[in-house]
Amino acid sequence: MSKHALQIASEILIVDDEEDIRDLIAGILHDEGYETRVAGDSDGALNAVRQRRPQLLVLDIWLQGSKLDGIQVLDTLKREQPDLPVVMISGHGTIETAVASIKKGAYDFIEKPFKADRLIHVVGRALEAARLRREVQELKLKAGDDSEMVGNSSAISKIVL
């Protein structure tokens, strides 16, 4: 799949409590050809993912005024949809926060303020990694059980064993 086709097929959900940050990220990603949706709090994020699963989630760690913070949203979504790639963002992040979010299943962590090039690069890598994981799963399903022998002659048995 070409980079352009991957972008057109990719819908990204952006979750941040600051409208200007949501708009900035959406604008950068739109300019790169991605489709975006936005949510401003944890309830909006969970509802948006459950209604129509995005290909990627860009999630702020500190969701002011929300029932859950970004780490709790990450925990919830990783239980429900473990293969959903999530990129965490924060302006108040520490190395410990970044490591904790990645240990909980985030693909990567971007500290605010960020450069547009970094965001574009991480989003592209996350989508490509998710695509490759899906392809591997599909190939494993097509290949079937690895332990099946093509034949059962003594010559084949000697080669396989």
Where are these regions (language model features)?
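Charged docking surfaces used in two-component/phosphorelay signaling
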Residues: 23-31
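AAA+ ATPase active-site-proximal loops
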Residues: 140-161
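Active-site beta3 strand of CheY-like receiver
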Residues: 52-58, 63
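Non-catalytic signal-transmission and effector/linker regions of two-component phosphorelay proteins
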Residues: 1-13
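Short amphipathic alpha-helix used as the core "switch/output" element in two-component signaling
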Residues: 47, 69-82, 100
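Short hydrophobic/Thr-rich beta-strand motif most characteristic of the beta2 strand and flanking loop
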Residues: 33-42, 48
